[in-house]
């Protein structure tokens, strides 16, 4: 049941409030991988953590407080905009009452901006170039990966479909289209609607299509009569929907409460879409971008001031099976119904187009810019729960709310503006980090040129700083060498345990041991002495060494490939000296990589002192990573790192990768089957669903069920956690620290105990360890914690433990072990005091200190008064003596 507080389809009762009164919405989610929720509050604007929005993003174990001052009375919809959730009833109604309040007069002193928009049916080609713009391969080439979507046959439509698109016209006659050359990249998107605070937007909409359609905006204010969503509750209006060949007029306004907040950028990215049937309408193509800016932020032509280039990109899996034109497309393609019935799943998969603005496999018109330009990327998300997109900008970094990133996260009905100042010339990809999405064509090309007369206002001075010697070597890796935690925690036998499918090597399964390739650090270029992994580095597990650098550094990586196939080292966030993709080292070969660290690789103005990145082998980024070749990289502001490499502002650093290692996509699958599979040849079915699932290891640094060691710290220590995520769309991880909280940055600093991670996101959270004991850290997604994505961290209460407890070993691998050693207690003056009594003790000590201070001040005052009186007496005697002497002289 897709429920809000246990109710579906608008049955949640008693959500009523008065207009002009402040309302707090406390939102939280629980559940599984499908519990990606975007709560859309129709008709009103929210403020969340200082930022304006009308949607809230909710995941398992995430908590959001949204503030609202409702303006327009009426009955309004709250809905999850994830398509399947909306369809299945995750909707509620809230009522805004006037409560005898006089509505405030909106001071709309800006322009009236008119747009003439038509819904027109078109024949759309997802791959107009006929080849992959990145690789040059023909889209229909067998085995290319793109042939699944573009090869036309008696059971496949190919890459051309009937769709409907919003198009802009010059006036109400709808005769002459608006032609803007730099908007060719919009593709299937409608025209950009722009406005400033104080403006009124008037949209004359002409539906020239064969279905009823509407326009429903995000991010602006509108009255009930102009809402484009259909309500079926019997009391609200039916929505302002245009029937075929009908014209309707929408009126939206941008009062101050709808514009960017103080912490927001000058412009906010939004979206408009048809909501007559939101799922089928948007899959048919009806969606467009909307830009709302602060007053004075737009030029006369509507472009943003201070921005040289702007691009609007929609990342979504357009499901042609759910388009209004599905039957028409099958009829046009003259498909054989008999063949379709034999392969329904394959046919439906071929119609799910992993598109950027309606283009696949880098067929989006190339996005050109100059080195040093200020580029605004307006990113939009749409779709269902699999539409979790980590948008990666290869070759350059971006800023999101003043924080440095290489990827921006998108979910259905989310909107992000990323600012880039490219300084790395070349041709690069924009792609979705989720491996299956990228393989299915969700990628595009952007080109950074060194333009004549275009001189960037920055100059970099680099200095050689750090050299790392890293070798790729093949090892046998055990994801779960000790099952005692798993069996005790879940209180089940091995066969009945959740982990049985992943850890058993019976019935054709492989168990927990696999051949893998890993990055390991050596002391010098001879690659004879490995750098030992003890103490601070023990927790890294399968990861390569933690590489560190500062802004202005040159990092040199001397890489030896001691594995049996070609591998490389490629890093996010740095400027690689080689042009294009990094060179691969053949088996036995040694290569040297040079990484420059410019300002744009380091922390942004709203970041912590250091930001986290990642490095991995990129010969085949997906198979190489699942084979094990991945490691952490952190870049700090100048002066943060000590000579030995650690941070001067932190006592400890931990890097954790949360990744479902899919051994089915490892280079070593066949070897692992031969080594660990059934002895009888042909016993293992590589395509069996149980076998496929058994090879998906829900790991933290390559370990399951609390087998990761080394997460140990002392009470009062400052700890930096570098939280990393890669993988597929199922790699949604909400990481919960038990008994501790941390600070994280999102424009400002916020306290939490859960951090959200998605493929391609790297977060830094900072903690002061305060609660002694051994505590659980785990992913809160239900399937993931059951599958072993959990571990322990220990906070030691005093330094003498260092002689007996230096790490979490097998003997203390259970949460119960240290719970009798000072857990929940603090040692004060040789006595163990319960943490819960510390506040009382502290209050008493403060009160006693104040009393003692007052007594000391009083005693000091008395002593000072006595001293002053003695001094006055001496002065009087001296004056009298002098007087007697004078009298004697006169006589």
Indicate where each model-derived feature is located:
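Copper-binding active sites and cupredoxin-like electron-transfer domains
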Residues: 1-891
């Amino acid at each position: 049941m897709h429920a809000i507080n246990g109710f579906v389809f608008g049955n949640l009762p008693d959500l009523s409030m008065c207009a002009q009164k402040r309302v707090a919405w406390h939102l939280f989610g629980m559940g599984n991988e499908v519990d990606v929720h975007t709560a859309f509050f129709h008709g009103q604007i929210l403020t969340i953590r200082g930022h304006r929005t009308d949607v809230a993003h909710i995941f398992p174990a995430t908590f959001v407080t949204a503030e609202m001052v409702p303006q327009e009375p009426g009955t309004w919809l709250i809905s999850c905009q994830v398509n399947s959730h909306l369809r299945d009833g995750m909707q509620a109604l809230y009522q805004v009452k006037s409560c005898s309040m006089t509505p405030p007069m909106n001071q709309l002193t800006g322009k009236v901006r008119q747009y003439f928009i038509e819904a027109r049916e078109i024949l759309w080609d997802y791959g107009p170039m006929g080849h992959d713009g990145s690789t040059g391969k023909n889209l229909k080439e067998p085995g290319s990966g793109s042939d699944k979507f573009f090869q036309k046959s008696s059971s496949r439509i190919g890459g051309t479909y009937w769709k409907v698109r919003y198009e802009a016209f010059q006036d109400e006659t709808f005769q002459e289209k608006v032609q803007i050359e730099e908007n060719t990249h919009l593709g299937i998107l409608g025209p950009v609607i722009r406005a400033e605070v104080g403006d009124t937007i008037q949209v004359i909409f002409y539906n020239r299509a064969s279905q009823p359609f509407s326009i429903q905006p995000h991010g602006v204010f509108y009255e009930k009569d102009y809402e484009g969503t259909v309500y079926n509750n019997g009391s609200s209006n039916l929505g302002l929907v245009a029937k075929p060949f009908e014209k309707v007029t929408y009126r939206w306004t941008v009062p101050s409460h709808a514009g960017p907040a103080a912490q927001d950028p000058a412009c906010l990215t939004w979206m408009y879409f048809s909501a007559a049937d939101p799922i089928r309408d948007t899959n048919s193509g009806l969606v467009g971008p909307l830009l709302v800016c602060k007053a004075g932020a737009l030029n006369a032509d509507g472009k943003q001031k201070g921005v040289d280039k702007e691009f609007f990109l929609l990342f979504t899996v357009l499901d042609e099976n759910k388009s209004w034109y599905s039957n028409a497309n099958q009829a046009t393609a003259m498909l054989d119904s008999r063949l379709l019935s034999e392969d329904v799943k394959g046919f439906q998969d071929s119609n799910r187009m992993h598109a950027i603005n309606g283009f696949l496999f880098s067929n989006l018109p190339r996005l050109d810019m100059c080195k040093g330009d200020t580029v605004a990327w307006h990113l939009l998300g749409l779709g269902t729960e699999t539409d979790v997109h980590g948008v990666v900008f290869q070759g350059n970094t971006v800023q999101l709310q003043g924080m440095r990133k290489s990827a921006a996260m998108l979910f259905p009905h989310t909107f992000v503006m990323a600012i880039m100042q490219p300084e790395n010339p070349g041709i690069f990809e924009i792609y979705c980090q989720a491996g299956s999405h990228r393989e299915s064509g969700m990628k595009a090309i952007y080109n950074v040129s060194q333009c004549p007369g275009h001189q960037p206002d920055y100059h970099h001075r680099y200095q050689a700083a750090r050299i790392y010697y890293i070798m790729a070597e093949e090892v046998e890796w055990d994801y779960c060498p000790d099952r005692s935690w798993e069996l005790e925690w879940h209180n089940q036998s091995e066969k009945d345990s959740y982990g049985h499918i992943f850890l058993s090597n019976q019935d054709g399964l492989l168990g927990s041991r696999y051949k893998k390739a890993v990055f390991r650090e050596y002391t010098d270029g001879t690659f004879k002495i490995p750098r030992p992994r003890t103490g601070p580095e023990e927790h890294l597990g399968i990861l390569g060494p933690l590489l560190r650098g500062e802004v202005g550094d040159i990092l040199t990586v001397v890489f030896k490939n001691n594995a049996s196939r070609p591998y490389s080292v490629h890093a996010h966030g740095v400027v690689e000296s080689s042009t294009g993709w990094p060179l691969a080292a053949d088996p036995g070969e040694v290569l040297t990589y040079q990484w420059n660290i410019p300002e744009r690789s380091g922390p942004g103005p709203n970041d912590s002192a250091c930001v986290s990145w990642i490095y991995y082998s990129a010969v085949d980024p997906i198979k190489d990573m699942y084979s094990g070749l991945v490691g952490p990289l952190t870049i700090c502001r100048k002066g943060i790192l000590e000579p030995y490499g650690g941070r001067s502002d932190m006592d400890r650093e931990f890097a954790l990768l949360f990744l479902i290692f899919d051994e089915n996509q490892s280079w070593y699958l066949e070897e692992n089957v031969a080594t660990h599979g059934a002895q009888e040849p042909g016993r293992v079915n590589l395509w069996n669903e149980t076998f496929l699932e058994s090879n998906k290891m829900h790991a933290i640094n390559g370990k399951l069920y609390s087998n990761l060691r080394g997460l140990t710290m002392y009470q009062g220590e400052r700890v930096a956690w570098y939280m990393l995520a890669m993988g597929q769309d199922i790699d949604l991880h909400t990481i919960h620290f038990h008994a501790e909280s941390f600070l994280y940055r999102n424009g400002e600093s916020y306290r939490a105990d859960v951090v959200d991670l998605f493929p391609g996101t790297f977060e830094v959270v900072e903690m002061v360890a305060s609660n002694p004991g051994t505590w659980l850290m785990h992913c809160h997604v239900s399937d993931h914690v059951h599958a072993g994505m959990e571990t322990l961290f220990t906070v030691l209460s005093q330094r003498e433990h260092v002689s007996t407890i230096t790490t979490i070993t097998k003997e203390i691998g259970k949460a119960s072990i240290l719970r009798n050693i000072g857990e929940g207690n603090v040692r004060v003056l040789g006595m163990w005091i319960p943490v819960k009594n510390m506040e009382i003790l502290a209050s008493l000590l403060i009160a006693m200190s104040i009393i003692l201070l007052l007594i000391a001040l009083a005693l000091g005052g008395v002593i000072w008064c006595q001293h002053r009186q003695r001094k006055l007496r001496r002065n009087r005697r001296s004056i009298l003596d002098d007087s007697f002497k004078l009298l004697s002289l006169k006589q």
